[in-house]
Amino acid sequence: MKDIKLKDKIAQGINDLFYIWKREFQTTFRDQGVLIFFILVPLGYPLLYSFIYDNEVVREVPAVVVDDSHSSLSREYLRKVDATPDIQIVSYCADMEEAKQMLKNRRAYGIIYIPSDFSDNIAKGKQTQVSIYCDMSGLLYYKSMLLANTAVSLNMNKDIKIARSGNTTDRQDEITAYPIEYEEISIFNPTTGFAAFLIPAVLVLIIQQTLLLGIGLAAGTARENNRFKDLVPINRHYNGTLRIVLGKGLSYFLVYILVAFYVLYVVPRLFSLNQIGQPSSLVLFVVPYLAACIFFAMTASIAIRNRETCMLIFVFTSVPLLFISGISWPGAAIPPFWKYVSYIFPSTFGINGFVKINNMGATLSEVAFEYKALWLQAGIYFLATCWVYRWQILMSRKHAIERYKELKEKENLSKQISD
């Protein structure tokens, strides 16, 4: 008899699990807000970010010149700088005040200053200098200014060395110009571009943030539709912790398997971003990342009291999470406190592991730290979600019983009055 009851309970639990999965799946596609965060945002945001940074590098940065030397050598230097793809000289200013005013009016983003003793020092065999002033509100402007001027100065240094060496053969000129021959190879980012460096991290973060917003919005809707403002409704199918957590989690997981494939595989391929990882390693890595994000979002949804709250709580976290992940800002430069704070979020391990696998060709064993951390987070947040929903079930029952007693007392009171 006990075996039959146990089998019935298991069968009922599985039936309830799929009922909850079905209801949550329907909510995803019927609720416009959830649909936006689960489908439209993951479809649109990756394309938007990728289109913005598709050029990879900034070209033809407007720059102005203050040339106090007025020599043939300074003019040669400026012609070569203007010939680079990085800088476009838009004006020659009489003094630094005029140049500063052009920067202030956003007509240029950098100043090239050549001192009056530029060619004299070179003729005397002394070291000279060229000063660069750049608008640091955009680091890519600074990068273009620095690269162009560095390349031109090195090229002119080579020509000056050769001219003064008195060599008689081309081979001697080569040795004079480059005593140590070197070859520059950009590993894992051949274009040294901004998109190849930043977009993979943004794509991984989009998955976590849209899950937080979508699940939070669904939780806010559930509370608003509940008579007692509880997260779990009074329903015989919602009479167990595991069936609720697994039913909801399975629904989100099935939706985001497709979303993750699009965001992490299709989008990088559309924009020709670096993809050298093994697909099998990537799939095995994404599974715990999705699980950790889903249960993390379900745990965090306990704080959501209405539909709008999730926007106030979660949206602003995107930029800080990108910084403390260790990709856009060097991990070694992040203070220990913020590094430990970053370990709370699945995106930290997800971003670092994905970049290593997808962009650097790492295997699963080479990202063992991130992989194990994601499974650990998935387990911890699963238990936290179970605790949260168990507490919500008890609170829902408590409110229902209190309401029942209240109605019963009113009924008894009305009978006494009528008698």
PLM segments and residue spans:
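Extracytoplasmic/periplasmic domains immediately adjacent to an N-terminal transmembrane anchor
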Residues: 1-196, 366, 391, 397-419
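Alpha-helical membrane-protein architecture signal
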Residues: 14, 18-22, 196, 237-250, ...
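Loop-to-transmembrane-helix entry motif
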Residues: 28-35, 206, 247-253, 257, ...
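Hydrophobic core positions of alpha-helical segments in small-molecule transporters
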Residues: 37-38, 200, 246-247, 310-313, ...
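Hydrophobic alpha-helical transmembrane segments of integral membrane proteins
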Residues: 38-39, 196-197, 316-317, 342
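Hydrophobic alpha-helical transmembrane segments of multi-pass membrane transport proteins
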Residues: 44-47, 185-267
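Membrane-spanning alpha-helical segments of multipass transporters and channels
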Residues: 48-49, 70, 91, 101, ...
